[in-house]
């Protein structure tokens, strides 16, 4: 469990973890049971984390966990779709890091993440398998979002637990205001088409 959840949530942030006292703002899109967001909140004591999920059941759980582990002052839990939250003034272009793990194909996730990033922010897409075709589709979507692929890193989890990839993306200018598109559209009509 610890390898597949906690370690898997933190290894992509190994650079950031070298400076755990910096006050970065993170948003975990499609947070589910709280990974990677909760792990980041614990590992980075000055970080502010927003956990975003559309399921009320999941966000109720996340609020309770945040309270129980004593981090409710640094963790904000939002029950809403990324396509909606990405247009709110208080969230749009307001984060140093926007992350998503096991949410959707990378080209779809990019449309969720890029609108949240500030001018120097980075999006982190956590993936298992990562193919050249997915990279090509992501690059196509990023052009429309006024963003670029910064790097991709591959990692073998300990104890033969599998291969993981993290794809770092970043804005190269302001994301067009029409993104993210309305609820469901990014998945039905990916920008890579």
Predicted segments with their positions:
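Conserved beta-strand signature within the Rossmann-like core of class I S-adenosyl-L-methionine
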Residues: 120-130
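Conserved beta-strand segments of alpha/beta enzyme cores
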Residues: 48, 74-76, 122, 148-151
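Short glycine-/small-residue-rich Rossmann-like dinucleotide-binding loops
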Residues: 102-103, 173
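Short alpha-helix immediately C-terminal to the canonical SAM-binding loop
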Residues: 58-60, 131, 135
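Helix-to-beta-strand junctions that scaffold the AdoMet/dcAdoMet cofactor pocket
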Residues: 71, 117-119
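Conserved SAM/SAH cofactor-binding pocket of Class I
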Residues: 2, 10-102, 110
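Short "lid" loop at the C-terminus of a central beta-strand within the Rossmann-like core
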Residues: 83, 128-132, 157
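SAM/dcSAM-binding transferase cores
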Residues: 136-193
């Amino acid at each position: 469990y610890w390898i597949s959840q906690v370690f898997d949530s933190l290894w992509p942030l190994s650079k950031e973890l070298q400076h755990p006292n910096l006050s970065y703002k993170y948003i975990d899109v499609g947070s589910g049971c709280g990974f990677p967001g909760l792990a980041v909140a614990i590992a980075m004591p000055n970080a502010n984390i927003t956990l975003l999920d559309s399921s009320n059941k999941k966000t109720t759980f996340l609020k309770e966990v945040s309270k129980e582990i004593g981090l409710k002052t640094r963790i904000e839990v939002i029950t809403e779709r990324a396509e909606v939250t990405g247009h709110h003034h208080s969230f749009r272009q307001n984060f140093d890091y926007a992350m998503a793990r096991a949410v959707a194909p990378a080209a779809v996730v990019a449309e969720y993440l890029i609108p949240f990033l500030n001018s120097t922010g980075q999006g982190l897409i956590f993936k298992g398998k990562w193919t050249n075709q997915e990279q090509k589709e992501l690059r196509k979507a990023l052009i429309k979002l006024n963003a670029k692929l910064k790097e991709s890193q591959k990692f073998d989890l300990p104890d033969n637990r599998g291969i993981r990839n993290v794809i770092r993306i970043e804005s190269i200018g302001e994301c067009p205001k029409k993104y993210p598109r309305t609820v469901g559209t990014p998945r039905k009509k990916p920008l890579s088409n």
